Swiss-Prot record:
Cited HAMAP family: UDG
NCBIfam families noted in UniProt: PRK05254.1-1, PRK05254.1-2, PRK05254.1-4, PRK05254.1-5, ung
Location of the active site: 59 (proton acceptor)
Cysteine disulfide links: none
Name of the protein in question: Uracil-DNA glycosylase
Keywords annotated in UniProt: Cytoplasm, DNA damage, DNA repair, Hydrolase
Chemical reaction(s) catalysed: Hydrolyzes single-stranded DNA or mismatched double-stranded DNA and polynucleotides, releasing free uracil
Locations listed in the record: Cytoplasm
Top-level EC class: hydrolase
This enzyme's EC code(s): 3.2.2.27
Organism: Staphylococcus aureus (strain NCTC 8325 / PS 47)
Coiled-coil positions: none
Cellular component annotations (GO), alphabetically ordered: cytoplasm
């Protein structure tokens, strides 16, 4: 199974013309993130056959030079967003990795699908592209991963992500959940939750190679 087939199946099942038309207008008349060519970067960097872990985000960062198509990740020269800083703090506490760069492309290439449930946003307006159709698309992506893959780790931080559990066959996949790494909630159960070592322990238990969460130039 490949993304091209899954995309075909989804667009055959659902009509996204209204969303397409909306996005054409938005990109023509407003500043929208990420750039058009990066909307689907999560799928470009993580082929379907390579998926070992799915980390769900919400919508892209809405500031300049941040979003580039991967949930929680920002472009190499951007400042660290607070949630990502907390993710790295937990990573250091969990498995001793100290990451210096704010982008997660190496995770994506390792097999971590960094999926936002909404893939675009207008500059400076969080959630501005909610309910235009992206949730239908990404719900189908989650279901496809659940249906066609086995032994995938789904990391679900915060209530919106955890609402997607209903789309996942928990009998053949691993669910790791906690509060969101946002500064508003990180001290209420994200710190100390050890998602990275737990994910690798599960992958190794089912005969898969672990994720290299540490800094990589690959």
């Amino acid at each position: 199974m490949e993304w091209s087939q899954i995309f075909h199946d989804i667009t055959t099942k659902h009509d996204f013309k209204a969303m397409h038309d909306f996005l054409e207008k938005e990109y023509s008349t407003a500043i929208v993130y990420p750039d058009r060519e990066n909307i689907y970067q999560a799928f470009d960097l993580t082929p379907f056959e390579n998926i070992k872990v799915v980390i769900l985000g919400q919508d892209p960062y809405h500031g300049p030079n941040q979003a580039h198509g991967l949930a929680f990740s920002v472009q190499p020269n951007a400042k660290f967003p607070p949630s990502l800083r907390n993710m790295y703090k937990e990573l250091a506490d969990d498995i001793g990795c100290v990451r210096q760069t704010p982008h997660l492309q190496d995770w994506a290439r390792e097999g971590v699908l960094l999926l936002n449930t909404v893939l675009t946003v207008r500059q400076g307006e969080a959630n501005s592209h909610r309910d235009i159709g992206w949730e239908t698309f990404t719900d189908e992506i989650i279901k496809a991963v659940s249906d066609y893959k086995e032994h995938v780790v789904f990391i679900l931080w915060g209530k919106p992500a955890q609402q997607k559990i209903k789309l996942i066959d928990t009998s053949k996949h691993c669910i790791i959940k906690s509060v969101h790494p946002s500064p508003l909630s990180a001290y209420r159960g994200f710190f100390g939750s050890k998602p990275y070592s737990k994910a690798n322990a599960y992958l190794e238990s089912v005969g898969k190679s672990p994720i290299n969460w540490c800094e990589s130039e690959a």
